[in-house]
Design a protein with these regions (language model features):
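Hydrophobic transmembrane alpha-helices and immediately adjacent juxtamembrane helices
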Residues: 1-138, 142-164, 168-273
Length: 273
């Protein structure tokens, strides 16, 4: 078996064993996500225009729910790849791990493998919950939507690699940056509401310049079965942006992480608390 595959399997098993030791935390996270989703749905009902038809209510709920799936993946990727490096530093195991002949790419990927399984379960459960609250969610073009979600996830891996490098440099302070990035994309990439809610200036000068915005837009409008909000007349352009993001982002992120890793080894700061 190739060494990189052995590393990936061993580290994935380690992460799964860690999660299995904290079942209460696992259940608590499920409950937390469900409560957040219910809060968003109820809030959307509160601001609903009187006389709005069921179709419009379902559309808005679908926009929120499908967008929130991308938010969950982004959040878990940042924390599990990015900030979990910090956890290894605190435990005192990062330096010995990275001085061993393990494949660094497999090590980083293993951190997100288990959490993606977890994320999939949470996402499916959350979507079923919203579907029950609003009387069903539209599910169209499932194959295309899953492809877009795959490209979105690989693009987020690049963010995770970058934040893993930043965490080595900033250590505990990186928490603030991770939280800031989460809320930045939640707002400006409209992950929990339609882009039409944002002021036109924000859409033109911020949202349209973020690849994440096109990932969110294309994923949820594909499932809903309507034209994208950002580029309604250029769907192929949105696909090109999403595919480019999914391919280029992890490459850039991994090279950045390797650069920070080598620099930290040279300076002797890799295992510093």
């Amino acid at each position: 078996m190739p060494q990189y595959l052995e590393t990936f399997l061993a580290m994935s098993k380690k992460v799964l064993v860690e999660y299995s030791r904290y079942p209460i935390a696992f259940v608590a996270l499920f409950v937390q996500i469900f409560l957040i989703i219910v809060l968003f749905v109820i809030t959307s009902f509160a601001f609903e225009t009187p006389g709005t038809g069921q179709a419009q209510t379902t559309r808005f709920a679908a926009m929120m729910a499908y967008g929130f799936v991308t938010n969950i993946i982004l959040s878990f990727t940042l924390w599990e790849i990015g900030f979990s490096i910090r956890e290894e530093q605190v435990r005192g195991t990062l330096e010995s791990l990275y001085l061993s002949p393990t494949n660094k790419f497999s090590n980083l990927l293993s951190r997100v493998f288990a959490i993606l399984l977890w994320t999939a379960a949470i996402s499916i459960g959350g979507l079923l919950l919203v579907s029950g609250l609003v009387g069903g969610l539209p599910v169209n073009n499932l194959g295309k939507a899953l492809f877009v979600l795959l490209m979105t996830t690989t693009g987020f891996l690049g963010f995770g690699f970058i934040f893993a490098g930043i965490t080595i440099r900033l250590k505990e302070t990186a928490q603030i940056l991770v939280n800031g990035v989460q809320f930045f994309f939640m707002i400006f990439s409209a992950q929990v509401f339609p882009f039409s809610v944002l002021p036109l200036a924000v859409q033109d000068y911020v949202s349209r310049w973020l690849p994440v915005s096109y990932c969110v837009d294309l994923f949820r409008t594909t499932l809903i079965g309507e034209a994208p909000e950002l580029l309604p007349n250029d769907v192929l352009v949105e696909y090109a942006i999403v595919i480019a993001f999914g391919i280029v982002s992890p490459i850039i992120g991994y090279f950045y992480y390797n650069w920070i890793d080598r620099k930290a080894r040279t300076e002797g700061t890799l295992g510093e608390y």
